[in-house]
Design a protein with these regions (language model features):
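N-terminal [4Fe-4S]-dependent radical SAM core
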Residues: 1-71, 248
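Auxiliary Fe-S-binding modules of radical SAM enzymes
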Residues: 1-17, 21, 38-41, 149, ...
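Homeobox/homeodomain signature
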Residues: 3, 9, 44, 49, ...
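Residue-level marker of positions within ordered structural domains that often coincide
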Residues: 24, 31-34, 78, 137, ...
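General N-terminal targeting signals
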Residues: 30, 46, 88-90, 149, ...
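Conserved AdoMet/S-adenosylmethionine-binding subsite of the radical SAM
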Residues: 54-215
Length: 250
């Protein structure tokens, strides 16, 4: 459990780590790079690098913090990967339910398994302190929103459009009804792919029209002006303005 520089959360909690590539957005996975670095450093728990690994010793970590905290769950993996047993996900949920003072953000690319877990396995029971999200990097992955929207009892349903690799338009604009929050950001790293300003403005405009909070995280390695430079130097402003809105909790 660690503090993080990710601006849309407060701490990361990794009761598991590791993943396998699933779609285009996975090509330059930051978590894979970090896991292999930790493996090379001999860090305990990362002996297998980025292979899917359960971390049962981490299950109770949130219980040690009394102050209400926002946790990004499995920042170094995907909780709904097929190699994570359902029984283990149950244990993660037990910890979440035992910590009602905290908020837990769960983000996945395995939208169908997440849907089946909450709708079928848990009979629609989603802990009130859980926010559920799916990653969408281009128009081909817009389909991931459908299973997410079908999880009716989620307090917050959100999209992480990072890295945004194309305009979210496939014959028609992405349908955002039923979505409570949208995060957007560009890719970082030496092999980062550019994010066009047009794509960002299109997504922001759709959010504005629906009254959905829009959180622009960063331009990444390629700036608003299309120039490649350090991601920090490229910043997180659009036309000089910061747009980092949060969902409204009923």
């Amino acid at each position: 459990m660690n503090n993080t520089k990710i601006p849309w959360t407060e701490k990361t909690w990794n009761p598991m780590h590791g993943c396998t590539k699933w779609s285009e957005g996975c090509a330059h996975c930051y978590a894979e790079t970090m896991a292999k670095r930790l493996q090379g450093m001999g860090v305990k728990g990362y002996e297998n690098g980025f292979a899917v690994t359960l971390n049962p010793d981490a299950l109770d970590e949130p219980k040690k913090i009394k102050k209400p905290t926002m946790f990004f769950v499995c920042s170094m993996g995907d909780l709904f990967h097929t190699k994570v047993p359902t029984e283990y996900i149950d244990k993660v949920m037990e910890t979440i339910e035992a910590c009602p003072q905290h908020t837990f953000q769960i983000l996945t690319k395995r939208d169908l398994r997440m849907h089946d877990y909450f709708v079928c396995h848990r009979n629609g029971n989603v802990p009130k302190n859980v926010w559920l999200g799916v990653s969408i990097e281009n128009r081909l992955q817009v389909v991931r929103t459908t299973p997410l929207k079908a999880i009716r009892n989620a307090t917050v349903r959100f999209l992480s459009c990072e890295p945004l690799l194309g305009k979210l338009h496939y014959g028609h604009d992405i349908e955002l009804d039923g979505i409570d929050w949208v995060i957007c950001g560009g890719e970082s790293g030496n092999q980062a792919r550019p994010m066009q300003k047009e794509w960002v403005l299109h997504l922001k405009d759709l959010c504005d029209k629906k009254g959905i909070p829009f959180f622009f995280k960063q331009w990444g390695t390629w700036g608003e002006d299309g120039v490649k430079r350090n991601a920090k130097a490229n910043g997180c402003t659009i036309d000089g303005q910061i747009y980092q809105a949060w969902p409204k909790i009923q």
